Amino acid sequence: MNKNLKNVFFVLIIMMVVLIIAYNYENNAGATKDISYSDFLNMLEPVEGKKPLGKLYKGNVDKYNKIQIEKDVIEGFYIPSEYLESKTAKPVKFRTTVAPLDKDLIASLRKANVSFDARSAEEGKFWSVIGSNILLIVILIGLFWFIMMRQIQSTGNKAFSFGKSKAKMTMDPKVKITFEDVAGCEEAKEELVEIIEFLKDPKKFHAIGARIPTGVLLVGPPGTGKTLLARAVAGEAGVPFFSISGSDFVEMFVGVGASRVRDLFDQGKKNSPCIIFIDEIDAVGRLRGAGLGGGHDEREQTLNQMLVEMDGFEKNEGVIVMAATNRADVLDPALLRPGRFDRQVMVDLPDIKGREEILKVHSRKVPMTSDISLHSIARGTPGFTGADLANLINEGALLAARKNKKRVTQEELEEARDKVMMGPERKSFFISEKEKEVIAYHEAGHAILGTLLPYTEPVHKVTIIPRGRALGLTQSLPKEDKHILPKTYWLDQIIVAMGGFIAEEFKFGVTSTGSSNDIQQASNIARKMVCEWGMSEKLGTVNYSGDQTNVFIGRDMGHSSKYYSEEFAAMIDKEVREIIQTCLNKGRDLVRKNASKFEGLAKALLAKETISHEELMTIVHPANEEGAKKKPEKTVKSKKQNGIKANPAYNE
């Protein structure tokens, strides 16, 4: 039944109810008055000296002018005495009981020329009472049921079917997503293409004795494209695709989750071959027996049912389960074993090539100028996910539209990247001249050390315009993605982090609260060098941090987070202080030796507020000096760097 027919049906029911109510009201207009039999006879044959109640109605309307006789009951209409002279008087309905011995009633009626009619007590009552009142009740119940069902369907639920699966089946979506719309995760695509080939041509795999994986688990950080990959599989497979969220299984009603799992797999078997996709499966697949509330709850029942459905006594031939999560560490081991989720596909952060491909995909529908360099944007966005890059392109388009441009230029993309990475500019934020000077020298300290040290990333931009929660920023962008970072790199990172502290100390003789985050960052690096990365000779290659994964309440509570004695705790603190102090001394020496460049950069920041990489290199490396950052020598003359031994292998 389409929407228009439903509306017509709804209107007809309302009209019927209104008509029945009006009919009953008309029939029962005015209350029936019970009178004595003597009063009735007095109106029929008035007695001298006794005033009658009125006059029996004998008008032209058949509805009123007949006396109805049903066994010992008489009903009719009369006009009260006080309204006899009125032409608009409305008859009053009366009822009386006939005396059982009155045999002259009929003769009296005939003598008075009163029309009358006799009927049995049952006649007409079924249709008048049952036909109107009960029919009205039935219609009202039907109307209530219709409204209730319509309301339930409009909210997407099913009445009395809490245990039914909420999975949505996709066969041929209008907006079809394919693997051409997915970039930056080629290995993951290859794994999934194999599953699609099996669904399209299973004989090819059966002939060689291969068994397709029962389940595929997509694992990766948020925003890397796990759900997008699943949508691409739905577009490519050409088979029914059921999608559901892990949170849709668990409700407030006990047993609903397990029932929905059964119903979901029943639907899958009926539509085999098919794919079932469960997004955020960690909502239902968490480790059993772990938690403050005990080992048995609704989630465990749901998980147990899912384990049975995926690999129990009954085989689900042709039903492939896909799932996505960014918390694979909290999933139950029984869910991850071969036979259930045979294959785990890692969807990690894209590298520079992957980021460039993702930018190309998202920029297809965005008009851009011909001089756009997506490679430079990709190089300047390390650690960005696919969702971040899509947001960057959208922000660039919004900025271009705000400037009334027809095409997006490199300027908008650069500005959008800075906005996504560092937050929007707060040009209206008031800063006094004294504070602005402190900020300028603080950022100049970061920038000058980041440019002079050999193992740091190139400084891309320095600004004293507040962005987000920061009052000033020094942005460094790597030339390439790095996966193995040596000790020398981290030592230089500590020096750069403390650059603002060193600059304030050198220029003003005192430091400010603006260095608090820098100190925290440097301390974290130094502590990891000592406790996790084995970069301390005194403490050796021992892990003092324990398991650094996210705590799972119930499994990890009560476990000690301290893996060393008080003696070693003091040694760790001492080693961390020594590393930071050594880096501070080297940073102070560099700033002191390059004081003129440091002053020039700070004054340029006060004048321009933002300094680009090219302007920075002009200040730090004038034309008469070497125009590039000094590179480390290929041979190691000394095995120590500022009193801390460095690994010679990384200096080559």
Swiss-Prot record:
Gene Ontology molecular function: any one: ATP binding
Keywords: ATP-binding, Cell inner membrane, Cell membrane, Hydrolase, Membrane, Metal-binding, Metalloprotease, Nucleotide-binding, Protease, Transmembrane, Transmembrane helix, Zinc
Keyword Transferase: no
Active site as annotated: E443
EC identifiers of the protein: 3.4.24.-
Spans within the Cytoplasmic topological domain: 1-4, 150-652
Cofactor(s) annotated in UniProt: Zn(2+)
Residues bound to ATP: G220, P221, P222, G223, T224, G225, K226, T227
Gene Ontology, cellular component aspect: plasma membrane
Family recorded in the similarity comment: In the central section; belongs to the AAA ATPase family. In the C-terminal section; belongs to the peptidase M41 family.
Designated name of the protein: ATP-dependent zinc metalloprotease FtsH
Organism, as annotated: Leptospira borgpetersenii serovar Hardjo-bovis (strain JB197)
Gene from which the chain derives: ftsH
